[in-house]
Curated annotation (Swiss-Prot):
One of its GO terms (biological process) is D-xylose metabolic process. Keywords: ATP-binding, Carbohydrate metabolism, Kinase, Nucleotide-binding, Transferase, Xylose metabolism. It holds the Pfam family FGGY_N. It comes from the Bacteria. This is Xylulose kinase. It comes from Streptomyces rubiginosus. Its EC number is 2.7.1.17. One of its GO terms (molecular function) is ATP binding. Catalyzes the phosphorylation of D-xylulose to D-xylulose 5-phosphate. The record marks 13 as: Important for activity.
Length: 481
């Protein structure tokens, strides 16, 4: 390892499937060491994971970082949002954590919306209408199905909170991750006692919300990690807010993440409240807001279409007239949970490459429609769209986003943006800088800019028309008679 120019910090991304750790030079942003270890997630009706796995994975990831991790002066945890972690009086998990993608609590979500003033109430109070991913619905599900677990619970945490608490011995969270629970009021930036009372959750069980820039604590003696006692621990945040930090995005800069699911978001200084539920009104990790919309069908759905056609994912061909809505897992944006994929306009001369391009078009159309709802009216339409995630380096994805958005597209070279965002937050504790400014100094968003091209209005109009005409069929789903 070459000598670092400044102090070292550790940024962690504890995601659904694995924990990744980066040791970063504060002066330059250079990653001097990294490590990664997997988690397991249950399959079947629910999606659960033992939080103790996350700790073991963190220990292993840091072990892989070697001596560099021992030299770190500060650490921060970024993590998967929404998960419900229930702990007993000794800090041990009462049961496995209910993860963000465990949708068994959908009925409880619908009931909570009805019981507490409707969607408008929730949007105005918490910034979001609670979907099955939100923690409040998971607590309601647990109270209904496993009341003995609720009775045994002495602390309620989010995934990143659990790891932070094991480092410091103190129960803390941050505004970014708290805003995805459904029991944090975005208007007052405090826990909502009415909502907590309605779901029977004692606020004393919840962690203290640490303000941006505040130290969450220091590393305590009794731990298994390579940090020295007294190493600073930042408050951490949820994965989307951490990625926004990792990019150093300024208000109004649009971000599109292409993964198994697709995500669009932008930082804004206006508190969002969308009663349709399309846009989640999250807080960011700095003091601003992070309106975000998500689609369920993105890279995995398009790859499935390519596999069915026997084509490489880049083997697209231009073609006009065929439309494919790749809603293979139902869809959240637009809100069509019972939908399936829909193909329209197939003719004798339609090629496999044209069908594959139509799948890309359908996936990107949904994301761009959501982006229009996320951006402020005064956002700069000429600002490049930051394209991140696993699909961002694919030529077919890049060209489809350019053609349908009419925007310039920038593809950051930096990877592991959640861990980099956590590292920037940790660095801010040492230097006093805004973490987003740290990331900009590190030039994490630097990458090739693809110039804007004329927007393909014909394809956009065709997609909008097919979606509108087919909405009753898509809403009914394949199981209805």
């Amino acid at each position: 390892m070459s000598a670092a120019e400044g102090p070292l910090v550790v940024g962690v991304d504890t995601s659904t499937q694995s924990t990744k750790a980066l040791v970063v030079d504060v002066a330059t942003g250079r990653v001097v060491a990294s490590g990664q270890a997997p988690h397991t997630v249950t399959s079947g009706a629910g999606r659960e994971s033992d939080p103790r796995q996350w700790w073991d994975a963190l220990c292993e990831a840091l072990r892989q970082c070697g001596e560099a991790a021992h030299e770190a002066a500060a650490v921060s945890i970024g993590g998967q949002q929404h998960g419900l972690v229930t702990l007993d009086g000794h800090g041990e998990p009462v049961r496995p954590a209910l993860l963000w993608n465990d949708v068994r609590s959908a009925p409880q979500g619908h009931r909570l919306i009805e019981e507490l003033g409707g969607a408008k109430f929730w949007a105005e109070r918490t910034g979001s209408v609670p979907a099955a991913s939100f923690t409040v619905t998971k607590w309601a599900w647990l109270a209904e199905h496993e009341p003995e677990a609720v009775r045994a619970t002495r602390a309620v945490r989010l995934p990143h909170d659990y790891l932070t608490e094991r480092l410091t011995g103190q129960g803390t969270t941050d505004r970014g991750d708290a805003s995805g629970t459904g029991w944090w009021a975005s208007g007052t930036e405090a826990y909502d006692e009415e909502i907590l009372g309605h779901v029977g959750l004692d606020p004393a069980l919840l962690p203290r919300v640490v303000r941006p820039g505040e130290v969450a604590g220091t590393v305590r003696d009794s731990h298994e990690l390579p940090f020295s006692k007294g190493t600073l621990v930042a408050c951490g945040t949820g994965d989307n807010a951490a990625a926004a930090l990792g990019l150093g995005v300024r208000p109004g800069t649009p971000v599109m993440s292409l993964g198994t699911s697709g995500t669009v978001y932008a930082v804004t200084q206006r508190r969002p409240a969308d009663p349709t539920g399309t846009v989640a009104g999250f807080a960011d990790a700095r003091g601003d807001w992070l309106p975000l919309a998500c689609t369920l069908n993105c890279t995995l759905a398009v790859d499935r279409v390519a596999a069915l056609l026997g084509l490489d994912r880049e083997a697209v061909e231009p073609g006009h007239g065929v439309t494919l809505l790749p809603f293979l897992d139902g869809e959240r944006t637009p809100n069509l949970p019972r939908s399936s994929g829909l193909l329209h306009g197939l003719r004798h001369d339609t090629t496999g490459g044209q069908l594959l391009q139509a799948a890309y078009d359908g996936a990107v159309y949904s994301l761009l429609a959501a982006l229009d709802l996320v951006l402020d009216e005064d956002a700069d339409p000429s600002a490049p769209l930051l394209l991140i995630g696993g699909g961002a380096r694919g030529t077919a994805w890049q060209q489809t986003v350019r053609r349908l958005s009419g925007r310039a597209v920038q593809v950051p070279r930096a990877a592991e943006l959640v861990a980099l965002g956590a590292a920037a937050q940790a660095a801010g504790l040492l230097t006093g800088e805004d973490p987003a400014a740290v990331a900009r100094r590190w030039e994490t968003a630097a990458g090739p800019v693809l110039e804007a091209v004329e927007r393909d209005e014909e394809t956009l109009d065709r997609l909008a028309g097919v979606l509108s005409d087919a909405a009753p069929l898509l809403e009914r789903g394949t199981g209805a008679g």
